[in-house]
């Protein structure tokens, strides 16, 4: 752990932001007001005069000093909260600069440590800034590289082409339905995912599905009564194809009966990520209900890697199930690859890209491994040897080159804390094959109603954009006990959120 002495007394939220900046350079760091023998020593100066925010930073390490200054003038006074954000950004700016000087590491995302950088781009776009003006702000005030700004520009262009009414889509809602079962739990996973076999034995799968039917009907009833339009539906989890074909059939029937005007829903996706759950019978059910967007996720095309991360299927099974789905009429298939999996380097990732090229799915999501706190991989980090920062960055470059050469375009992006190399996860697709749900959830432009185990509801105020969240219980037994209360709570929030909107 890097021990960093900060000679000023800062507010807790300032320390938190500066710690995020330090962690871009060091795997783990902690800022102290007082400590003996620090690894780094940092002096800050800052002031606000009228609407001008000025900061300076000096880093002392190993007898060397590194200096940086920054100043920005704003047109308006801003609220107290906005003033606080402005100063945190100004302090982040100079700390990032001195750490880049010291380490020689250039942070491509600059001071942006949040999950959704495209959301910031859309904010500037809605404020009326031109493309050139947005580029200048991102470069000067956020220190984002030209390469990443170009990536954001490409993504926003695809999003607006896919959803021309993106700025008005807050009048509609999308729905996420969580089925929390998987054949096994992967080592990197923190989603609500429970091995299906033991839950089947205890009867918990059947009881959960009974509750899920009820929740779908009750939420659907509210949507119909309030004449709400549904943009998209996403079945996730877990792996929703872990259950039997007959159980899937019954759920989709309830979906079509419960939600308003299903023929007008723009997109329905079913996450079939684990190839070992895909069967001809289940594919037939999907086709019966007009669902042709699914995910078949290899993650890697190296059997040893799959074994190491707890995915109990083979590479060949992934390939076979892809073609089974394709020959069953599935014409919009997504596949996922993960950069930085244990014991994988340039050679293994190139092999994964070569194998993907033989399949050519409609979309490809390239994830960078993130050490999430609750995952098996994080709890036992010493067991899993992963690539260094330079290798991970090279693999991301390989993915970008491969997608360009094969006619895929980036259309959504998100980042995570503790992600290898401070990189990003990017969704690519062939033109016209973009996922509507992925765009609306990443850009937080409309309410997502979460149904099922561990499902997160994200309520976006249709006029102010203010976001509130509600989480269903993660564990199946707790969900079974509490789902009725969860339904009541969500309907209560929906009534309050849309009361004014629905009476207009």
What are these regions (language model features)?
Residues 1-131, 164, 427, 431-504:
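Radical SAM enzyme core and accessory elements
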Residues 178-193:
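Local cysteine-cluster metal-coordination motifs and their immediate loop/turn environment
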Residues 193-398:
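Conserved non-cysteine loop/helix-boundary elements of the Radical SAM core domain that shape
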Residues 240, 418, 454-457:
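Short, glycine-/Ser/Thr-/acidic-enriched flexible segments
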Residues 31-40, 374-451:
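A C-terminal junction/extension of Radical SAM enzymes
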Residues 102-106, 126-176, 226-227:
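N-terminal [4Fe-4S]-dependent radical SAM core
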């Amino acid at each position: 752990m890097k021990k960093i002495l900060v000679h000023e007394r800062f507010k807790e939220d300032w320390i938190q932001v500066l710690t995020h900046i330090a962690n871009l350079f060091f795997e783990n760091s902690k800022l102290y007001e007082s400590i003996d023998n620090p690894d780094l020593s940092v002096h800050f100066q800052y002031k606000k005069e009228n609407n001008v925010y000025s900061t300076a930073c000096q880093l002392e390490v190993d007898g060397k000093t590194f200096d940086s200054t920054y100043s920005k003038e704003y047109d308006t006074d801003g609220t107290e909260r906005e003033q606080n954000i402005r100063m945190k950004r100004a302090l982040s700016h100079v700390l990032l600069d001195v750490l880049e000087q010291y380490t020689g590491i250039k942070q491509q995302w600059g001071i942006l440590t949040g999950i959704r950088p495209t959301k910031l781009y859309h904010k500037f776009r809605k404020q009326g800034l031109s493309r050139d003006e947005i580029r200048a702000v991102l470069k000067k005030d956020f220190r984002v590289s030209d390469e990443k700004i170009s990536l954001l520009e490409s993504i926003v262009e695809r999003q607006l082409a896919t959803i021309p009414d993106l700025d008005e889509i807050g009048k509609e809602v999308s729905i996420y339905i969580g089925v929390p079962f998987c054949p096994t739990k992967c080592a990197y996973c923190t989603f609500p995912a429970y091995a299906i076999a033991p839950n089947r034995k205890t009867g918990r799968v059947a009881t959960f599905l009974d509750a899920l039917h009820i929740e779908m009907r009750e939420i659907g009833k509210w949507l119909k009564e309030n004449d709400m339009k549904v943009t998209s539906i996403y079945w996730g989890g877990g792996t929703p194809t872990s259950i039997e074909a007959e159980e899937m059939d019954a759920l989709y029937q309830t979906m079509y009966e419960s939600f308003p005007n299903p023929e007008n829903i723009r997109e329905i996706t079913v996450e079939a990520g684990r190839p070992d759950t895909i069967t001809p019978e289940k594919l037939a059910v999907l086709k019966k209900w007009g669902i042709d967007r699914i995910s078949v996720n290899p993650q890697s095309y190296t059997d040893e890697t799959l074994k190491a991360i707890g995915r109990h299927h083979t590479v060949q099974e992934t390939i076979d199930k892809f073609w089974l789905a394709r020959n069953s009429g599935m014409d919009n298939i997504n596949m996922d690859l993960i950069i930085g999996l244990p014991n994988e380097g340039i050679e293994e990732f190139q092999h994964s890209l070569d194998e993907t090229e033989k399949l050519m799915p409609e979309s490809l999501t390239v994830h960078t491994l993130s050490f999430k706190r609750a995952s098996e991989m994080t709890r036992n980090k010493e067991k899993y040897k992963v690539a260094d920062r330079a290798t991970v960055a090279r693999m991301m470059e390989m993915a970008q080159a491969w997608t360009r050469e094969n006619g895929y375009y980036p259309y959504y992006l998100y980042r995570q804390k503790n992600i290898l190399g401070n990189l990003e996860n990017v969704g690519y697709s062939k033109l016209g094959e973009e996922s509507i749900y992925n765009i609306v959830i990443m850009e937080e432009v409309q309410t997502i109603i979460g149904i099922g185990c561990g499902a997160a509801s994200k309520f976006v105020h249709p006029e102010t954009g203010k976001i509130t969240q509600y989480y269903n219980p993660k564990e199946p037994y707790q969900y079974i006990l509490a789902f009725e209360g969860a339904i009541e709570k969500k309907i209560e929030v929906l009534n309050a959120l849309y009361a004014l909107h629905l009476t207009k």
